[in-house]
């Protein structure tokens, strides 16, 4: 099949797990013989005169990175304007698709959108080429904000999500919990939803057994620095852990809008010197940290899947996670990791303590987690299942959509 993948993240532009997901899915589909074109973007803030649109084949995938138009929008301050400008640049690039190295046009059999930020280009291109549109919903605005859609920007994002979901001919989620979430938020009358878990290339994350600890315990968080990730709970748990395990440290790897606030939280809990913010790490640096850490701590309040949990499991790092959403499906409590309820600082501290107090049991769980990856989270399996969704998707007749009322507490059970 000829697949047009539309994503606001694709290497080297990677913000979080979405970019890694699209990369691995695209390369796995290409390896299976499909003709894959990824439509993405140049890095934010780049000048089109020095960073023009590019069209290259990497790992068997044709990647078109649309240049950023010369505007003054920033993602942090002008998110919706920035997103619309990005979408406009993507549409222009998508309308000019030619078969690589020729003047012949290239026409997709399906358009695959990844999240609301590419709703406008994906919907426009699927309509232009008159082909089915499949959308993977990686997260929702209501989910990220504990069930609430409050404020102008959140309402705008939620409305675009609703539009994307209702324009889709087929939908994919990476966990059963996300299936339930988008059905509750946007149903009834949606296209068929298929749950396809994330995968992992375990060979890139070699397993390393923990060596007997000779010094203070080292904990590791990896991910975006956003409120819904619950990093502040790990910081709040650190003083409790240092009372029973003196010298315990927490390394925080990642970037995000809440870094300054998290530093304030570490100062508030008097663990700033025991907390290390290392920013974004390359693969080699991250792997070294995973191999050294006594536990990977992922205390999310909201997590549609949790790709970092798979990466830590592959590397052999004992897992301590919340049992929310996709994390509750990716980690089997007591078998492949230790889980606790989200927002439960005392429970999180107790879960980490159980890992530190019984390293042999932690190693048994780590080995079981690695073994499970090979059977349940293989990218070729993910690609095969995704291709089946493409084949089954049929472009439906479009009708004008009414503006739906937005319920402020959209997920009342959160």
Swiss-Prot record:
Disruption phenotype: Inactivation of Rv3032 affects the production of both glycogen (two-fold reduction) and 6-O-methylglucosyl lipopolysaccharides (MGLP), but not that of capsular alpha-D-glucan. Cells lacking this gene are not affected in their multiplication or persistence in the BALB/c mouse infection model. They also show a slightly slower growth than that of wild-type at 37 degrees Celsius and a completely abolished growth at 39 degrees Celsius. Moreover, in contrast to wild-type, they are exceptionally sensitive to the TreS inhibitor validamycin A; the sensitivity is abolished by overexpression of TreS. Pathway: Glycan biosynthesis; glycogen biosynthesis. It catalyses: [(1->4)-alpha-D-glucosyl](n) + UDP-alpha-D-glucose = [(1->4)-alpha-D-glucosyl](n+1) + UDP + H(+). The keyword Chloroplast does not apply. It is an enzyme of class 2 (transferase). Its EC number is 2.4.1.11. GO terms for biological process: glycogen biosynthetic process; lipopolysaccharide biosynthetic process. GO terms for molecular function: alpha-1,4-glucan glucosyltransferase (UDP-glucose donor) activity; glycosyltransferase activity. Gene3D superfamilies: Glycogen Phosphorylase B. Keywords: Carbohydrate metabolism, Glycogen biosynthesis, Glycogen metabolism, Glycosyltransferase, Transferase. The keyword Glycosyltransferase applies. InterPro entries: Glyco_trans_1, Glyco_trans_4-like_N, Glycosyltransferase_grp1. Glucosyltransferase that uses UDP-glucose as the sugar donor to elongate alpha-(1->4)-glucans. Is involved in the biosynthesis of both 6-O-methylglucosyl lipopolysaccharides (MGLP) and glycogen. May also use ADP-glucose as substrate. Attempts to disrupt both the Rv3032 gene and glgA in order to create a mutant simultaneously deficient in both alpha-1,4-glucosyltransferases turned out to be unsuccessful. Thus, M.tuberculosis H37Rv requires a functional copy of at least one of these two genes for growth. Moreover, it is not possible to inactivate Rv3032 in a mutant lacking treS, suggesting the joint essentiality of the different alpha-(1->4)-glucans biosynthesis pathways involving these two genes. Belongs to the glycosyltransferase group 1 family. This is Glycogen synthase.
């Amino acid at each position: 099949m000829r697949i047009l993948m539309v994503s606001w993240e694709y290497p080297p532009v990677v913000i979080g797990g979405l970019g890694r997901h699209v990369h691995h899915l695209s390369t796995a589909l290409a390896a299976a013989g499909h003709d894959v074109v990824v439509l993405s973007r140049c890095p934010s803030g780049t000048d089109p005169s020095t960073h023009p649109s590019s069209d290259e084949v990497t790992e068997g995938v044709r990647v078109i990175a649309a240049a950023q138009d010369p505007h003054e929008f920033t993602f942090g301050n002008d998110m919706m304007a920035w997103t619309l400008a990005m979408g406009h640049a993507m549409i222009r690039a998508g309308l000019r698709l030619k078969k690589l190295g020729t003047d012949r046009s290239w026409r997709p059999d399906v358009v695959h959108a990844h999240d609301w930020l590419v709703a406008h280009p994906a919907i426009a291109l699927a309509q232009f080429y008159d082909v089915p549109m499949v959308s993977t919903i990686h997260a929702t605005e209501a989910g990220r904000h504990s069930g609430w859609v409050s404020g102008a920007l959140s309402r705008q994002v939620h409305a675009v999500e609703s539009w994307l979901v209702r324009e889709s001919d087929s939908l994919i989620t990476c966990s059963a919990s996300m299936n339930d979430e988008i059905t509750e938020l946007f149903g009834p009358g949606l296209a068929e939803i298929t749950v396809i878990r994330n995968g992992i290339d375990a060979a890139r994350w070699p397993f390393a057994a923990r060596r007997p600890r000779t010094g203070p315990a080292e904990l590791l968080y990896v991910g975006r620095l956003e409120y819904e990730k619950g990093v502040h709970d790990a910081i709040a748990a650190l003083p409790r852990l240092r009372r029973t395990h003196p010298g315990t440290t927490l390394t925080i790897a990642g970037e995000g809008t809440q870094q300054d606030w998290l530093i304030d939280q570490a100062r508030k809990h008097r663990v700033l010197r025991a907390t290390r913010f290392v920013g974004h790490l390359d693969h080699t640096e991250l792997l070294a940290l995973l191999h050294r850490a006594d536990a990977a701590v992922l205390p999310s309040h909201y997590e549609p899947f949790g790709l970092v949990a798979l990466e830590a499991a592959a590397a052999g790092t004992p897992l301590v996670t919340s049992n929310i959403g996709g994390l509750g499906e990716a980690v089997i409590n007591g078998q492949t990791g230790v889980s606790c309820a989200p927002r439960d600082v005392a429970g999180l501290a107790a879960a980490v303590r159980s890992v530190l107090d019984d390293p042999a049991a932690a190693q048994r769980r780590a080995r079981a987690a690695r073994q499970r990856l090979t059977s349940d989270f293989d990218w070729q399996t993910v690609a095969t299942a995704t291709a089946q969704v493409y084949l089954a998707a049929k472009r439906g007749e479009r009708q004008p959509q009414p503006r739906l009322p937005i319920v402020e507490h959209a997920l009342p059970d959160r």
